[in-house]
Amino acid sequence: MTTPPSTPGEVDLGAYEAWLFDMDGVLTKTALVHAAAWKEAFDAFLKEESARTGKTYAPFDPESDYEKYVDGEPRADGVRNFLAARGITLPEGEDSDPPTAATVCGVGNRKNDLVLAVMKKQGVQDYEGVTELIAALKSRGVKVAVVSASENTVAALTAAGINQLFDARVDGHTVKDLHLAGKPAPDSFLQAAKDLGVDASRAVVLEDALAGVEAGRAGHFGLVIGVDHHDEGDSHAYADQLHEHGANVVVRELTELVSH
């Protein structure tokens, strides 16, 4: 297919060999959980930093800062990105650092502990249309993979009851083990396509993050679908951004892809 479709109604579910799904904000309603956990972890650190240095305390914004610095990024990269924007550099530390440690790993571990606690208490909900879309794809012989920077991918998908649906998984552990660059680099999506034995031009990327659709474009995937779950008032502006950053098609719900 030389010209990708530009509207949901033009998407042929059987036209590509594989679909590669981001997790947070596409498959599962965990993006808000992650944003809140990042805020609590960063704000605790920033308050400590303010008390230590006398700098004005400015809290983490769970919308703009989340989207700009941490959404779709491996945990350590998210810590580095945000703190660099605040002019703060921390020692890397070790994976085993306690959540109170003033290191990249320590701040990341604090955030991770918060996410796991919320998932354990509240569970994880998948978005409407996930199981229907994947069933429709599989009925056409299409392979599906989940691609996420989260090291909690299996836990989140299992909690949502959809872990068994995927033919391949590239997650935060894969990224770390294979030294893959984070989004907007296309490495994680390219690895998923490789694991499925499919050329990037014959695969679809589904992403809600701007860095994610950029990764889809950078990897020369056959089709990049942006998923915009923003409220109606914010939707058009974000949909435009998704298009600008590389999405061929933008949907508000996955049901739009199976309802035609």
Short names for language-model regions:
Residues 4-5, 9-23, 27-128, 139:
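N-terminal helical cap/lid subdomain that shapes the substrate entry/recognition surface
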Residues 10-11, 256-260:
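Short amphipathic alpha-helix with an adjacent loop that forms part of the alpha/beta core around
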Residues 142, 151-204, 210, 214, ...:
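Substrate-recognition "cap/lid" segment bordering the active-site pocket of phosphatases
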